[in-house]
C-alpha cells in the first residue's frame, strides 16, 4: 500500500489578532484564544493536523513588525537576521472558528525562548501577529495502523491528528511529558492506545530519551508496509529515530515515515 501526504498551498497573508481567552490545560500547557476581523478568510483546513502559523510577538502593541507579502505571494524576509521584525516562532493551529473568527494556540510554558515566556505573562487584550499558514499537509487516512511519538511541543498537533483520523483507525501513541500532572484529556476512537511517559519519574530523564527507548522497544507487530509513523520532538532525537527506523526498512516503507524536528536543544 502506498501512503502519502497531500500538500495544499494557501495564499500568504499577514494578520493580527487579540487575546480574548486564556485557559490552562495543564501546569505546562496553556491555550490562548485570539480573535480579530483580520482572521476573515483564514486558510485553515480541518483535515490538516500539522497546519501551523508564524506568530509574531511585539514588545509593545505599537511595535508589531512583520514581513511584507510581495506581489508574487512570497514574503520579504530581508533584514530578519538583523532584527527587522518582531520576534517570531512557529505554532500549530489547534482550532479555528470561522464564524466567531477565533484562533486557538496551545503554548508550552517555559522560561526560555519567545513563545513560552510570552504565554506565561499573556493577558486579555494582548496583540499577536499571525503569518500564514503558507501551505497545509493532508495526511493519509487509509493506513492499516498509525504509530506516534510526541512530546509537549507536538501534543497540540497530535490532538488534531486524533480528531482528523477515522474513528475506527488503529493508533498506538507514546507521549512524553514532565509528569502525570502534564497529561491532558484527548478525544479519540475505540482503537487508540495512549502511552504516557514521564520524564520526572526515576530521577528525571533527558528530553526525548523515553520516546527513543519506546521506539527501540517497539513490537515488530506494530509495523507493516501499511503503517504510517509520525514523530515530532527534539531535533537530535529525531535524527536518532531516523537512523533506527532506516535499519527497519524491511518492516516499514520509508515513504510512510514522517519525522519532524519541532525544536532543538541549545548546547
Language-model features, listed with the residues they occupy:
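Extended, composition-driven regions rather than compact fold-specific motifs
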Residues: 1-267
Amino acid at each position: 500500500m502506498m501512503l502519502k501526504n497531500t500538500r495544499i498551498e494557501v495564499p500568504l497573508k499577514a494578520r493580527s489578532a487579540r487575546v480574548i481567552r486564556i485557559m490552562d490545560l495543564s501546569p505546562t500547557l496553556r491555550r490562548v484564544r485570539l480573535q480579530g476581523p483580520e482572521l476573515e478568510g483564514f486558510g485553515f483546513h480541518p483535515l490538516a493536523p500539522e497546519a501551523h502559523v508564524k506568530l509574531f510577538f511585539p514588545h509593545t502593541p505599537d511595535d508589531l513588525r512583520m514581513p511584507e507579502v510581495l506581489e508574487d505571494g512570497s514574503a520579504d524576509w530581508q533584514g530578519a537576521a538583523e532584527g527587522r521584525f518582531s520576534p517570531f516562532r512557529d505554532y500549530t493551529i489547534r482550532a479555528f472558528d470561522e464564524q466567531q473568527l477565533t484562533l486557538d494556540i496551545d503554548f508550552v510554558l517555559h522560561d526560555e525562548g519567545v513563545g513560552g515566556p510570552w504565554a506565561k505573562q499573556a493577558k486579555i487584550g494582548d496583540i499577536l501577529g499571525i503569518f500564514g499558514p503558507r501551505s497545509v499537509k493532508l495526511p493519509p487516512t487509509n493506513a492499516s495502523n498509525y504509530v506516534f511519538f510526541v512530546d509537549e511541543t507536538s501534543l497540540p498537533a497530535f490532538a488534531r491528528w486524533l480528531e482528523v483520523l477515522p474513528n475506527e483507525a488503529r493508533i498506538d501513541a507514546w507521549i512524553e511529558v514532565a509528569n502525570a500532572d502534564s497529561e491532558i484529556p484527548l478525544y479519540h476512537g475505540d482503537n487508540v492506545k495512549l502511552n504516557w511517559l514521564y520524564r520526572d519519574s526515576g530521577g528525571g530523564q533527558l528530553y526525548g530519551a523515553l520516546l527513543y527507548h519506546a521506539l527501540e522497544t517497539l513490537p515488530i507487530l506494530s509495523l507493516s508496509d501499511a503503517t504510517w509513523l509520525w514523530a515530532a520532538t527534539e531535533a537530535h532525537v529525531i535524527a536518532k529515530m531516523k537512523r533506527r527506523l532506516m535499519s527497519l526498512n524491511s518492516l516499514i516503507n520509508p515513504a510512510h515515515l514522517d519525522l519532524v524536528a519541532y525544536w532543538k536543544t541549545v548546547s
